[in-house]
């Protein structure tokens, strides 16, 4: 099976289980989506391996809660996920990722830099 990045508009029972493993701090009811607030996920073998929340406002986009399940980290899932989010939103010219909740800032800084983001005092920016 191929790794697929998709925008989640509805959550299956399995999606809810997988999102609970990705984001144990969020309840299913807090994961509402619309045109401004989106969730993108990486799916492999019908299971979600990673996800990111996206908030859009005109030409600005904010990423938060980017997380890949521990067992599948360091295999390019997060990079592919962010690249596809950016590609899926061509009208967004400025992206922001806050460092709130980042588990290891040095690892995340290297990851974001590899994606073309520049470090700011409280996160990363890509224009």
Curated annotation (Swiss-Prot):
PROSITE patterns: GNAT
Disruption phenotype: Deletion results in a pantothenate auxotrophy. Deletion mutant accumulates pro-PanD.
Subunit and interaction comment: Interacts with PanD in the presence of CoA. Monomer.
Protein's recorded name: PanD regulatory factor
Pfam family, one: PanZ
Zinc keyword on record: no
Ligand binding (CoA): 66-68, 72-79
Any single GO BP term: zymogen activation
Functional note: Controls both the activation and catalytic activity of PanD in a coenzyme A (CoA)-dependent fashion. Binding of CoA or a derivative to PanM leads to interaction with PanD, which promotes the processing and activation of pro-PanD, and subsequent substrate-mediated inhibition of the active form of PanD. Lacks acetyltransferase activity.
InterPro entries associated with the record: Acyl_CoA_acyltransferase, GNAT_dom, PanZ, PanZ_GNAT
Residues covered by the N-acetyltransferase domain: 1-127
Family assignment from sequence similarity: Belongs to the PanZ/PanM family.
Keywords in alphabetical order: Pantothenate biosynthesis
Gene Ontology molecular function: any one: acyltransferase activity, transferring groups other than amino-acyl groups
């Amino acid at each position: 099976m191929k790794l697929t990045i998709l925008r989640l508009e509805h959550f299956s029972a399995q999606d809810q289980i997988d999102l609970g493993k990705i984001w144990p701090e969020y309840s299913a009811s807090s994961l509402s989506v619309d045109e401004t607030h989106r969730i993108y996920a990486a799916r492999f073998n019908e299971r979600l391996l990673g996800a990111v929340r996206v908030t859009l406002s005109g030409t600005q986009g904010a990423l938060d809660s980017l997380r890949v399940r521990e067992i599948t980290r360091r295999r390019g899932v997060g990079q592919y996920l962010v690249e596809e989010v950016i590609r899926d939103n061509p009208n967004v010219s400025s992206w922001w990722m806050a460092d709130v909740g980042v588990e290891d800032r040095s690892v995340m800084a290297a990851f974001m830099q590899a994606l073309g983001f520049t470090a700011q005092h409280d996160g990363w920016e890509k224009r």
